[in-house]
Amino acid sequence: APVVAPAPAPAPAPAPAPAPAPTPAPAPVTVAAPKAVEYPLGVTEIVKNDAGTAEFDLFIVHTNDVHARIVPADGGMGYSKLSTMLKMGRALTDNILVLDAGDVTHGTNLANMFEGETVGVLLDMLGYDAVAPGNHDFNYGADRLIEAARFAEEYTDLKVLSANVLDENGYLLFQPYQVYDFNGFKIAVVGLTTPDTATKTHPKNVQGITFANEEIFEIGQMAIDMAKQYVDYVIVLGHIGMDPDGASGLTTDKIVSKIKGIDLFIDGHSHTTLKEGMKIGDTLVVQTGDYMKNLGLVQLHVKNGKVTATYPMLIPAADVLNAKDSALAKQYGITDVPNDPQVDEYVGYMSAQLSQKLNTLVATLPENLDGERANVRTKQTNLSKLITMAMTAESGADFTITNGGGIRASLKAGNVTMGDVINVLPFTNIITVVEVKGSDVYAALEHGYSKLPDQNGAFSQTDLQVVYNRFAAPGKRILRVLLNGKAIDRNATYKVATNDFMAAGGDGYTMFGKVLSEGSLLSDVFIEFLKKNYPVK
């Protein structure tokens, strides 16, 4: 039977009610914002799209080895056109990730004169999500790069990522990875920097820094394994490259073969053009070449948290610069890719600042220095002698061999500006030290002197004493080569300063051996040499 509670005693009559008080306003309701997802090492997830769509296309735009080609140059499209293309893409979808695989901040006067600031601002303006530092991004010194990374972290959405750049105590100098969320589909981007950086920038730029040369596979696998616990897709943004002749011997294919779990490797450093990417095991490797001659695009089709299809491609700069005649552009109904006026305005402003810098006085010369084309391509001149002296002194090499074709103007007696020197040495060449056997020194000079009496851009400018017979048959012209008054030993090995173009076999100098180190810009070194020896009066 149901249990019935006893009836309560009758309540006392209520007291007369007081006058009603005014009804207070309801307290405001505080709604807590969703807590940002945090991952190991203090990494906070970035939500790029939270629409919750289960099936969608994701577009990964990538560049590498732009080397500060800010405006169209050397076959590249420049940042103004790229900005317009990105705006076109973002007008259609929020599912876009923009990444750069390094060597981006150094390489032209518009970047170099401002220690990379011009490029950093442009990367932010264009909405880049992440960049992995390359060896030449250290050319302004590690402190400058670290400062730029911290500035980007505080004031922009750009991340500078590298999981293998360590200080002298073994601590990471950069954020190692970043997680991005597209409709619940999570991507980890892990940065890597080539251990070749130890020798492919001036040693002073990376003093006290290591690149986990021996531990990179272990560190990389740990990073990927950790990422796989939290994300659906792993991208390595690596300035590593395909060149097996690098000082470290570390190449992308070695990393991909030994580190498991990488879905996409966006590569740089070797300036390799992979038109449709390259599969190594289960990993897709992509690289665009250099100077923004191509824009990389990887389209992922995502369904219920899984990638069901991947479409890599390159968009050639020629199709962007001349869209009206491009079959590729016509497929998408594009007839013109105009410049972005905001980018043009900024580049114009910085170009004006550059002009002011180039007017800075650096030296006062007592005499004219001869850089006339017909002379520097057939004989030593007083200008070429000073340039080779500066290269040897800066690099610590035994001597210098550089190409006469790299000297493009003379310097007049009197005041010399920074712009005057850059007119002499306009190619942003980097001083490079190579290992060369004595017999190959003779071979290099024979090559350089082979076209005499005709002019030759490959003519060897050197601070060695060269005794030669210009009328002998090519290949038999060099009689004797002296270093500090002593004959070069054909069986000995020497450290030779040259430029990065020649070290890579440019102008036919294929006899140069292993690269020992890369240093500063040749123009910067010569400016400092003139300042020291011919101060402004």
PLM segments and residue spans:
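Gram-positive cell-envelope targeting signals
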Residues: 1-2, 108
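Acidic, metal/ion-coordinating pockets
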Residues: 34-324, 378, 382-390, 400, ...
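Ser/Thr/Gly/Pro-rich low-complexity, disordered linker/stalk segments of secreted
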Residues: 2-41
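Catalytic centers of hydrolytic enzymes
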Residues: 39-57, 68-70, 83, 87-91, ...
